[in-house]
Design a protein with these regions (language model features):
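Bacterial N-terminal signal peptides that target proteins for export
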Residues: 1-9
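C-terminal segment of classical bacterial N-terminal signal peptides
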Residues: 14-22
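Extracytoplasmic "Venus flytrap"
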Residues: 26-46
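Alpha-to-beta junction loops
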Residues: 55-57, 75-84
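Short helix-initiation/N-cap motifs at beta->coil->alpha
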Residues: 60-72
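Contiguous mixed-secondary-structure segments that line small-molecule binding/active-site clefts
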Residues: 85-141
Length: 141
């Protein structure tokens, strides 16, 4: 199963996926950040990758300054996971991909409530999507 982290304009970052069978092995994750390795999203991904070592995962971050390239690399199997914006992640999961829709969250307080609602464990089933025989799961927002 692939996991999806979704970035919104109101939160700092997000990502899309890694395969469940690769959890104990080395996991390549493409990270979209306009500033590449210098960007805030990439730096947060580095913190996440460091924390993942404590869970037994070896995460290799691959910076991408073009979101389409990150997505295409993910589709081509060059990365088991990808950090991307919610707009692009919508093709994988419409539930999480709708959080930063235009006019959907007119202020940060509403955005925080939407994110909290989306990440509530009662909505776990909505974070998993089956597309063309492949499962994708939103892993973070």
């Amino acid at each position: 199963m692939k996991k999806i982290w979704v970035s919104t304009t109101l939160t700092a970052f997000a990502a899309i996926g890694f395969s469940a069978q690769a959890q104990a092995a080395k996991i390549d994750v493409c990270v979209f950040d306009l500033l590449g390795k210098s960007g805030e999203s990439y730096q947060m991904a580095q913190e996440w990758a460091l924390a993942a070592k404590g869970w037994g995962a070896e995460v290799n971050l691959i910076p991408r300054q073009d979101e389409a390239v990150a997505d295409n690399d993910f589709k081509a199997g060059k990365c088991e996971g990808v950090f991307m914006t919610a707009m692009r992640a919508r093709q994988y999961n419409k539930f999480a991909g709708s959080i930063d829709a235009l006019g959907g969250a007119p202020n940060n307080a509403i955005a925080q409530r939407a994110i909290s609602f989306a990440l509530d464990k009662r909505n776990a089933a909505k974070m998993v999507t089956n597309l063309g025989g492949k499962k994708y799961e939103v892993a973070g927002i």
